């Protein structure tokens, strides 16, 4: 028994979880088990849970101990006890009640099944988008729904046999004259034989159509039709062209779906259920609050309705001879609706409710959503070596770095710090090392920073919808309690700085650290894996910052000077509005302008004149200056809208100044450094080994 449980949770044996289709034989294998006396159990046939007097599970019910195992380890329903795993104890099951003497944990994974009296459609593959059954059968969804819920009949094609019905496909038996004309030619039994032979409805008709599909022929025919549509030229009619485009997209989806079925060895008819799995009892518990009160899972109540309706349909099909067809069809529809409520309550209309008008919680509700089993229990559970905090912007960080608060870092990397303290003989044992960490000695932070320089961490923001939701960073210690993040990586996380929280995880094994370095670093995930567009692009706060940085007095000097709102900026001591150099300073280079800003002599958006090397061919010859100022030495200034030319007496160009702001200078320098770094990296990659291009 211990080996059986260890194999269930072995991480090397079970490394992934996949939701997909299984065959009825596989469901039977999961559920059936052979008792030591040769009896086969596993089918749930009774809609009962516990006996109201003995408070024990009903035999062949939803909590049957013969099917799902004992409630208490080694104790059968009769109360007898056997030592688990003792081969000397014989027999290994109770001959009176048929319960095996095994560990009670078996009730957490042992499944049962319900043998359906009539095939039932799996609603996920019919109503969810995209509808796989619609894609395979190439029929409208409303027609298939009418067929599944017994609103239409399907005329069966019978090969090499004489048929009464010459039509093929759907027929509405209830409205058309078939209902009154066909039975005239038959007796009651003969008509039942004819109807079962040439007409079908419900999930059985869908199952028959899916079983008759040839997936390879579907691929061939779809490919031929797609090529024919591709060769057609546009008609000019927008509606017709869109219709052709939708048909081509449908054919591509159909071919991909057929290829997937062939590649995974899945048969399409498995989308119609003949055996309905019953979850283990521990996953749908029932609790006793008081002596008279029980609290049970909604899934148990839905299972009970399914068993009631299935047993009723079985009786109608087997025991009753002259049962009206309408009654059988109605019961098949009720069974289909009950299974729909179990899988996805409310997807097909009005949801199933209890006596207090409360909607039952289906399997889809248990699995999906933020509070579902996957996101809350499997993905959102607390794990060791992980933390969580609010994110704030870190504009000075490199793209592959993040700021980790000291309080979080010392907790996550405490084991690593203790190891290094002992290895460097700074602490004699673990207790002394922990004492130094509690006292926050300076040597602790030095060792911690050394560890962080070579150990990546993983940052994750829920929900993790694609692989860029988890990325690797090299952490640096920061003050405060918030995680600092570079704004360029926010798009991959779909994060912003309005209170979002992110989780930090420490990869422990060498394999995990290698994967983080080779595949998950943020500077290695610059493009979207789906469409190839840049994922590290300025958004939100960065765009606002760039706007503020370059939103100084960007308009030309003429517009600013003669604008009444800006006249006070140019008014001099003589109360006129002519140009004066005192208002807008001149700088020989960008370093002088930055120095003046640091000395608080100018502002970030203040207009200024910067000496610039400008190609004279760029200057328009026909452009006339706005003003010309002459100096006492003969030099003069030609002032244009966005630049200024200093000429000598001989009209030679001495200097050229451009009108800009300090924000534009900062942005230009960043772009220039980035281009130079990119060019240097490209040159180094093309040069032979040992030769490198130095900056400058």
Curated annotation (Swiss-Prot):
Keywords: Chloroplast, DNA-directed RNA polymerase, Magnesium, Metal-binding, Nucleotidyltransferase, Plastid, Transcription, Transferase, Zinc. Its EC number is 2.7.7.6. InterPro entries: DNA-dir_RpoC_beta_prime, RNA_pol_asu, RNA_pol_N, RNA_pol_Rpb1_1, RNA_pol_Rpb1_3_sf, RNA_pol_Rpb1_clamp_domain, RNApol_RpoC1. Zn(2+) binds at residues 76, 78, 94, 97. Mg(2+) binds at residues 496, 498, 500. It comes from the Eukaryota. Its main location: plastid. It holds the Pfam family RNA_pol_Rpb1_1. SUPFAM superfamilies: beta and beta-prime subunits of DNA dependent RNA-polymerase. The keyword Cell inner membrane does not apply. Binds 1 Mg(2+) ion per subunit. Binds 1 Zn(2+) ion per subunit. It is found in: Plastid, Chloroplast. Its cofactor is Mg(2+); Zn(2+). It catalyses: RNA(n) + a ribonucleoside 5'-triphosphate = RNA(n+1) + diphosphate. GO terms for biological process: DNA-templated transcription. In plastids the minimal PEP RNA polymerase catalytic core is composed of four subunits: alpha, beta, beta', and beta''. When a (nuclear-encoded) sigma factor is associated with the core the holoenzyme is formed, which can initiate transcription. Belongs to the RNA polymerase beta' chain family. RpoC1 subfamily. PANTHER family: DNA-DIRECTED RNA POLYMERASE (PTHR19376), DNA-DIRECTED RNA POLYMERASE SUBUNIT BETA (PTHR19376:SF68). This is DNA-directed RNA polymerase subunit beta'.
